[in-house]
């Protein structure tokens, strides 16, 4: 990067717009090269050619977006630390409460919040992320988390015990499955009933808390992959796209073919 800046300082005027543009396209703005990106952006902005100057403005915008993202995520980590002097704070969230088919899945995650220069950028409510971004982040989270655990209840359990019971149960099991016992558990939405530990609930926690957001992401990716596998066995329900939710294609298939073993019969009373 330093060599590129040196080269640009010496030869920018002799480079065509296309050459400069191609060089800029190859650059990835990240936490390790912010100072160099700023220097390069300033250099390009000073160029008398408007199209080259605009590349500098674009590079500066990308840098500012990164800085804003760092600040947003840092605040999520600080939120987790704001509850007191707890060493290990876990976040727990679920996915799959509303679908007509498939399990309800919960994940619990403990992050290392001691180094705010080593945070996981772009974490958020899993529903706000693209499928590709969720999958990418899920791997990063599992690699960097101090501990994580995933739990689920299948459709049979949901029919037998009710979705509310199963929602609470997967929260408990995910927390109990952690290799590190959390000093505090932050749960998305509501308190965990009959939980043997300290617990605080956070409304819309997956947008406020780093550990809840991470739990949301790995739970979503895990469940989506389960439903994609079911799609191979039951292709007519389009599980790969709807992951069990009641889309028109899914409901039409239910009416034409009937339910499968993974459908929640207690959810189908108003459909069949």
Swiss-Prot record:
Q: Which reaction does it catalyse?
A: Endonucleolytic cleavage to 5'-phosphomonoester
SUPFAM superfamilies on file: Ribonuclease H-like (SSF53098)
InterPro entries recorded:
RNase_HII (IPR022898), RNase_HII/HIII (IPR001352), RNase_HII/HIII_dom (IPR024567), RNaseH-like_sf (IPR012337), RNaseH_sf (IPR036397)
In which compartments does the protein localize? Cytoplasm
Gene3D superfamilies membership: Ribonuclease H-like superfamily/Ribonuclease H (3.30.420.10)
- The residues that hold a divalent metal cation are 93-94, 188
- What Pfam families does the database record attribute to this sequence? RNase_HII (PF01351)
Cellular compartments per GO CC? cytoplasm; ribonuclease H2 complex
What's an example of a GO molecular-function annotation for this chain? RNA binding
- Cofactor(s) demanded: Mn(2+); Mg(2+)
Which residue windows are transmembrane per the record? none
Question: EC number(s) in its UniProt entry?
Answer: 3.1.26.4
Please give the biological process terms from Gene Ontology that the record holds: DNA replication, removal of RNA primer; mismatch repair
Q: Cofactor: bound how, per the entry note?
A: Manganese or magnesium. Binds 1 divalent metal ion per monomer in the absence of substrate. May bind a second metal ion after substrate binding.
For this UniProt record, the keywords arranged alphabetically read as follows:
Cytoplasm, Endonuclease, Hydrolase, Manganese, Metal-binding, Nuclease
Q: For the RNase H type-2 domain, which residue ranges apply?
A: 87-272
Job of this protein: Endonuclease that specifically degrades the RNA of RNA-DNA hybrids.
Q: Which NCBIfam families match?
A: PRK00015.1-1 (NF000594), PRK00015.1-3 (NF000595)
Q: Which family does it belong to?
A: Belongs to the RNase HII family.
Q: What is this protein called?
A: Ribonuclease HII
Record the organism. Answer: Clostridium perfringens (strain 13 / Type A)
């Amino acid at each position: 990067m330093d060599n590129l800046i040196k080269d640009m300082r010496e030869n920018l005027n002799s480079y065509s717009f296309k050459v400069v543009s191609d060089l800029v396209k190859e650059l990835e703005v990240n936490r390790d090269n912010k100072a160099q990106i700023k220097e390069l952006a300033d250099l390009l902005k000073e160029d008398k050619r408007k199209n080259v100057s605009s590349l500098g403005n674009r590079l500066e915008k990308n840098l500012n977006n990164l800085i804003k993202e760092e600040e947003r995520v840092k605040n999520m980590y600080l939120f987790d630390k704001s509850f007191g002097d707890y060493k290990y704070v876990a976040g727990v969230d679920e996915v799959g409460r509303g679908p007509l088919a498939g399990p309800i899945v919960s994940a619990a995650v403990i992050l290392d919040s001691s180094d705010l220069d080593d945070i996981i950028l772009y974490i958020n409510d899993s529903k706000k992320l693209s499928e590709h971004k969720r999958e990418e982040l899920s791997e990063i989270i599992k690699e960097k988390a101090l501990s994580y655990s995933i739990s689920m209840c299948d459709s049979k359990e949901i029919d037998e015990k009710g979705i509310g019971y199963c929602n609470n149960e997967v929260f408990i099991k995910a927390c109990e499955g952690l290799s590190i016992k959390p000093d505090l558990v932050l749960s998305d939405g509501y308190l965990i009933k009959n939980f043997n530990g300290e617990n605080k609930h956070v409304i819309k926690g997956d947008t406020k808390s780093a550990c809840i957001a991470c739990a949301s992401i790995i739970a979503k990716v895990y469940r989506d992959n389960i439903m994609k596998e079911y799609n191979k066995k039951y292709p007519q329900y389009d599980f790969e796209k709807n992951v069990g939710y009641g889309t028109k294609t899914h409901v039409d298939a239910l009416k034409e073919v009937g339910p499968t073993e993974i459908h929640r019969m207690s959810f189908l009373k108003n459909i069949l």
